[in-house]
């Protein structure tokens, strides 16, 4: 006689975030002597591994999360999937940088090795959370079959610096909101965000130190253009993505638009400590154009309209040419 056993099916999900690669030989040639002391200090902080025992699941996870209403569960699954894939992407990049730089630039290699450790820890923790909702990522498959986007080394540093800093502000903002309003903490992963975000912050500081070791990357007219470009790219990407996922933020008691503007302003303030210019994110036209861009993007997703796509690019151009804020003169006074 056969016994019927009801099991939960775990779906292997393949996502489509960006995975990056770069010119490792060129990166190996970079001279970091101009800011070596700061880089060494940050690597020493990495060695201490403050979060070694932080990412351990406790009894709060021991619930049947698949009984959550399907609409809510779907938003959580997507949040966890996107977060896990982003962390895993960072792990792959940092691990490869550590391996390639081991012989030519051992200090940077050590720093990237510690950051890959952190990212792997984050990705693994998120993947376990995904299993609570009946989903998991085949990280080995992702490693072998992902398409990689090539970025020149200095662009990798701009992009990852901002990615880590915006990640810090996202995590700490969610944590502080739920700490103040615990009734919205509907899943226990958020209580880990306070220490988790410190990993992101330290990673951002490491990239900032590398950028400062190459003064031409943060001074001069070309660097001003590139800093504006990457700031705008990161802010617009987050804004368009999050406004498409308002329901998730409502689940945890946040307004997606207000949350994003807070994160944008805080990340812009952080970047002002490093970049020679930042965006005037409080300019009335900046706010208006961001909203117009989001509306055009939502319409394009529904219709694939060429006019909507043209509207998006027009908004992006207008956003880019808004006069930036000169921060270089304030570097010695910003706290």
Swiss-Prot record:
GO terms for cellular component: chloroplast inner membrane; chloroplast thylakoid membrane. It comes from Cyanidioschyzon merolae (strain NIES-3377 / 10D). Belongs to the AcsF family. The keyword Plastid applies. The lineage of its organism: Eukaryota, Rhodophyta, Bangiophyceae, Cyanidiales, Cyanidiaceae. Its main location: plastid. Pfam families: Rubrerythrin. It is an enzyme of class 1 (oxidoreductase). Pathway: Porphyrin-containing compound metabolism; chlorophyll biosynthesis (light-independent). One of its GO terms (molecular function) is iron ion binding. Its cofactor is Fe cation. Catalyzes the formation of the isocyclic ring in chlorophyll biosynthesis. Mediates the cyclase reaction, which results in the formation of divinylprotochlorophyllide (Pchlide) characteristic of all chlorophylls from magnesium-protoporphyrin IX 13-monomethyl ester (MgPMME). Transmembrane segments: none annotated. Keywords: Chlorophyll biosynthesis, Chloroplast, Iron, Metal-binding, NADP, Oxidoreductase, Photosynthesis, Plastid. The keyword Iron applies. NCBIfam families: AcsF, PRK13654.1. Its EC number is 1.14.13.81. SUPFAM superfamilies: Ferritin-like. GO terms for biological process: chloroplast organization; light-independent chlorophyll biosynthetic process; photosynthesis; regulation of tetrapyrrole metabolic process. The gene is acsF. It catalyses: Mg-protoporphyrin IX 13-monomethyl ester + 3 NADPH + 3 O2 + 2 H(+) = 3,8-divinyl protochlorophyllide a + 3 NADP(+) + 5 H2O. This is Magnesium-protoporphyrin IX monomethyl ester [oxidative] cyclase. It is found in: Plastid, Chloroplast.
